[in-house]
Amino acid sequence: MSNIIKQIEQEQMKQDVPSFRPGDSVEVKVWVVEGTKKRLQAFEGVVIAIRNRGLHSAFTVRKISNGEGVERVFQTHSPVIDSISVKRRGAVRKAKLYYLRERTGKSARIKERLG
């Protein structure tokens, strides 16, 4: 029974997901439905957490919009996501960057990973 579930989940998973880690700046293009119109909306920010659970994998992106911190959780293999592009690689030592929630300005910056 579990082999059937694994096979179905494998078919549902996206193959074109780029590799990114916490600290990386990414741009996620999401399909948004407004009335009868359907358009792409970009959400660009820093990945502060990744949850790896196969088909149920998710990642959290944080950005500052009009001086207010905005976080959004995306399901990695969701059909709502059109594309994910990595803009900048960040050098961090933790898997969860929740400490960025309390920081503002220069203390919230992340060094760029070289190589």
From Swiss-Prot:
InterPro entries: Ribosomal_bL19, Ribosomal_bL19_CS, Ribosomal_bL19_sf, Translation_prot_SH3-like_sf. Pfam families: Ribosomal_L19 (PF01245). GO terms for cellular component: cytosolic large ribosomal subunit. Belongs to the bacterial ribosomal protein bL19 family. One of its GO terms (molecular function) is structural constituent of ribosome. This protein is located at the 30S-50S ribosomal subunit interface and may play a role in the structure and function of the aminoacyl-tRNA binding site. PANTHER family: LARGE RIBOSOMAL SUBUNIT PROTEIN BL19M, RIBOSOMAL PROTEIN L19. This is Large ribosomal subunit protein bL19. The gene is rplS. One of its GO terms (biological process) is translation. Keywords: Ribonucleoprotein, Ribosomal protein.
